[in-house]
């Protein structure tokens, strides 16, 4: 007994790390490994090839592909339809999102012929699902990536940018940034764990104080967050967060977050969804968490069709897209429309400007 105790003391950290590793392995039982996830994504692509395509937006530090599932009746084609994305596993130790997003994809595939909501999404939206943004962090059972960087603090920030050069970012961050530069998303949500609330911009304040800091589209973001919370089993009943929603800066300010970057740099309305009180619950809780969040995920994506403006502007003579811009009155927002437009700003007055046409003021 004494010998064993001395042996453990001499080993010090390695004994503790081995014990921690075993605990982490036990916690991960029932969850997909990165290899399992890749197989599941590719199997989905084969099984549901008529309404999907599989692609990668890049690789993690350790070279793991960041797989995306696109769901649409015309996957990979450019259409005058809005695009929405879900991003899971931003933090490696918050894996519920990666499990739920695969279930979401499979549920839509299994039900889009017989379920009106699934059919609405397939026929009217391009839904993109990135189950795991941080596969290395998941493998290491920790929040940060392989370089131990918190990816949700790694994006250029409006107040405290460390470096706005995309090349200075982590590979996973760069992949997401390039993704949004190549593709136009109207809405988005990232899935996290450790609380139960739908969080919306702004996430930070200029003076770093904790208070409500509204973005120009505060009403629309509150509407989106409420769709999620009120479609959820019990999120809207929260005693900590009225209605199950919160302004990020009021909860706790963060800087370098993906949510604010989406809104500022890509015109994409992103929520941060905390979907489980426990960051890494036992795997036997996943079916219940899926049932609690299923309608919220579906209704949030479907809200793009039920609200907002989306389409393209063509010349009636040539059929070619026309260059122009859209301005929303009362909001400091101008969007180029040559490649199509998806706008998700609630009830507003829209002004369309086409430089090739003298009378180009249109209100909608």
Each predicted region: which residue ranges?
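Active-site/substrate-binding loop(s) of hydrolase catalytic cores
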Residues: 78-226, 230-239, 262-263, 270-275
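Short, acidic Ser/Thr/Gly-rich low-complexity loop/linker segments typical of extracellular
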Residues: 322-349
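A short, solvent-exposed loop/turn motif at the edges and junctions
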Residues: 350-364
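Short, surface-exposed beta-strand/loop micro-motifs that present aromatic residues
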Residues: 66-76, 258-264
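A short, amphipathic beta-strand motif
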Residues: 309-316
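Short, Gly/Ser/Thr-enriched beta-strand-loop segments that form substrate-interacting elements
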Residues: 55, 241-264
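Short glycine- and acidic-rich boundary segments immediately preceding or forming the N-terminal edge
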Residues: 10-65
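Beta-strand-rich domain onsets/edges
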Residues: 281, 286-308
């Amino acid at each position: 007994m004494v010998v064993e105790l001395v042996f453990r003391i001499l080993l010090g950290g390695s004994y503790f790390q081995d014990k921690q590793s075993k605990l982490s392995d036990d916690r991960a039982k029932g969850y997909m490994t990165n290899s399992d996830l890749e197989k599941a994504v590719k199997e989905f692509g084969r099984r549901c090839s008529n309404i999907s395509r599989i692609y990668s937006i890049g690789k993690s530090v350790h070279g793991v592909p960041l797989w995306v599932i696109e769901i649409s009746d015309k996957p990979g084609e450019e259409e005058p339809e809005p695009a929405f994305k879900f991003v899971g596993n931003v933090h490696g130790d918050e894996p519920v999102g990666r499990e739920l997003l695969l279930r979401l994809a499979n549920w839509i595939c299994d039900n889009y012929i017989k379920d009106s909501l699934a059919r609405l999404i397939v026929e009217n939206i391009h839904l993109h699902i990135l189950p795991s943004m941080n596969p290395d962090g998941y493998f290491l059972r920790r929040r940060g990536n392989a370089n131990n960087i918190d990816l949700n603090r790694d994006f250029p920030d409006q107040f405290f940018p460390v470096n706005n050069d995309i090349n200075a970012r982590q590979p996973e961050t760069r992949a997401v940034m390039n993704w949004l530069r190549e593709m136009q998303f109207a809405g988005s949500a990232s899935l996290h764990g450790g609380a139960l609330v739908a969080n919306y911009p702004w996430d930070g304040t200029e003076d770093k104080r904790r208070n409500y800091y509204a973005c120009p589209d505060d009403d629309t973001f509150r509407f989106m967050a409420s769709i999620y919370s009120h479609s959820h089993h019990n999120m809207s009943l929260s005693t900590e967060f009225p209605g199950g929603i919160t302004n990020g800066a009021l909860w706790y300010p963060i800087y370098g977050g993906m949510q604010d970057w989406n809104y500022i740099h890509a015109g994409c309305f992103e929520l941060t969804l905390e979907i489980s009180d426990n960051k890494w619950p036992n795997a036997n809780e996943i079916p219940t968490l899926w049932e609690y969040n299923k309608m919220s995920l579906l209704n949030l994506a479907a809200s793009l069709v039920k609200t907002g403006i989306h389409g393209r502007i063509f010349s009636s003579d040539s059929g070619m897209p026309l260059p122009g811009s859209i301005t929303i009155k009362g909001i400091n927002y101008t969007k180029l429309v040559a490649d199509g437009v998806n706008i998700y700003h609630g009830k507003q007055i829209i002004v369309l400007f086409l430089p090739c046409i003298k009378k180009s003021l249109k209100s909608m």
